From Swiss-Prot:
The lineage of its organism: Bacteria, Thermotogati, Deinococcota, Deinococci, Thermales. This is Dihydroorotase. The gene is pyrC. One of its GO terms (molecular function) is allantoinase activity. Its cofactor is Zn(2+). Catalyzes the reversible cyclization of carbamoyl aspartate to dihydroorotate. Its EC number is 3.5.2.3.
Length: 426
């Protein structure tokens, strides 16, 4: 038994407390206290449902020098995540039931965050032959995606949506037009021209989202079941507007935004620092503000990290050669708690929802509200500020564009089904 005393509760329904939360048998037993072997003082902290990340690259199999299941899932629980969706662009790609099953079994044995693998939409992520969606789902896959690559063949995407629809599986897309994106390393515009760097235009994202929404319309018309499209790492104002219009028209589309697109802009590239090189690229301030509005009005369903670890040597290469990607599992919530809630008054209830019930809805999972009988997959968050220090990361990627930023809202206790998987109590 664990008793968390004098703690505020925050979930998608709102805030309440302070209360005394008794945990046992993997569930919340009482909100009125009780006898417990371990007592945690929650004074000044708040308790939330465990977070779910829809989009993380754990690099296993094939690139364990960058990250592996242990380091990635340990980073996850240190970031307050009890559940995580791993992307399939590994080496080899996760495109068979056997590969999905192997990941699930290894992750379960580690006893950290619960892993929910995404499987490739097409064999080897080559964009040609569809993978066996039903068998992948039986093995544990929760969505289909060729993330890391773009879906260039609209016919293949349509067939994938039609295949996934009766299974209730969402199809997630990395929405960039490869012909427009070309070799861009930062947002296309005056700053890229000034710096002499190849640009990736915002129209590359908007054009691909527009096409994919038309493909979704086609699949919706042709399928007796409901196809579900999920747009990954939205980065532009126009892309957001397209998703907003589609939702208002009743299309079954969901979308996510990342911590880096919500807190950073292309201005960070003035230093030519590859730490800020990410795909899609950091955009302008107008795009960032549009994303924040999308969080509030429901256009964006979830905040997803797109955690993308690389080796230190790779990220120290010059900007043109360094790989795309930012590691963020361990700082995502503190970053947005500080930058959005504390500094801008973004509602805490809504912020927590974007880390919990929002991503759960994308996967078709029920909400986790804090009440008696609820599964005790929880995170205790401390508002006390401390600086970001990537040298203390559990992730193998011990670098960060937010190094030195003073943030509050750090996870100090993470539980999965009542088991403590991370503890950093003072």
């Amino acid at each position: 038994m664990i008793l968390i005393r004098n703690v505020r509760l925050v979930d998608a329904m709102g805030e309440r407390g302070p209360l005394d939360v008794l945990i046992g048998e993997g569930r919340i037993l009482s909100l009125e206290g009780g006898e417990a072997k371990q007592v945690v003082d929650g004074t000044g902290c708040f308790l939330a449902p465990g977070f779910l990340d829809l989009h993380a690259h754990l690099r296993e199999p094939g690139e364990e020098v960058k990250e592996d299941l242990f380091s990635g899932l340990l980073a996850a629980v240190r970031g307050g995540y009890t559940d995580l969706v791993s992307m399939p662009n590994t080496n080899p790609p996760v495109d068979t039931p056997e590969a999905v099953r192997a990941l699930k079994e290894k992750a379960k044995a580690l006893g950290l965050a619960r892993l929910h693998p995404a499987a490739a939409l097409t064999e080897k992520q080559e964009g040609k032959t569809l993978t066996p969606a039903g068998l992948l789902q039986e093995a544990g896959a929760v969505l289909l995606t060729d993330d890391g690559r773009t879906n260039e063949d609209a016919g293949v995407l349509a067939a994938g949506l039609l295949m996934a629809a009766p299974l209730g599986l969402p199809v997630a897309v990395h929405a960039e037009d490869a012909g427009l994106r070309r070799n861009g390393v930062m947002n296309d515009g005056p700053l890229a021209d000034l710096l002499g760097l190849p640009g990736n235009p915002p129209e590359a994202e908007a054009a691909r989202i527009a096409r994919d929404l038309e493909v979704l319309r086609y699949a919706l018309r042709r399928s007796p079941a409901t196809p579900r499209l999920h747009v990954q790492h939205l980065s532009t104002k126009r892309g957001l507007e397209l998703v907003r219009e589609a939702k208002r028209a009743g299309l079954p589309v969901t979308a996510e935004a990342t911590p880096h697109h919500l807190t950073l802009t292309e201005e960070a590239l003035r230093t030519f620092d590859p730490l800020f090189k990410v795909a899609p690229p950091l955009r302008g301030e107008e795009d960032r503000e549009a994303l924040l509005e999308g969080l509030l009005d429901g256009t964006l369903d979830a905040i997803a990290t797109d955690h993308a670890p690389h080796t230190q040597a790779e990220k120290e290469m010059d900007l043109l050669r360094a790989p795309f990607g930012i590691p963020s599992l361990e700082v995502a919530f503190p970053l947005l708690y500080t930058e959005l809630h504390l500094k801008r008054g973004f509602p805490l209830r809504r912020l927590v929802e974007l880390f919990t019930d929002g991503p759960r809805r994308v996967l078709g999972l029920p909400p986790l509200h804090l009440e008696e009988g609820t599964e005790a997959s929880l995170v205790l968050l401390d508002p006390k500020e401390r600086p970001v220090d990537p040298q203390g990361f559990a992730s193998k990627a011990r670098f960060s564009p937010w190094t030195g930023w003073r943030l509050g809202g750090w996870p100090v206790l993470t539980l999965v089904e009542g088991r403590i998987v991370h503890e950093a109590l003072e």
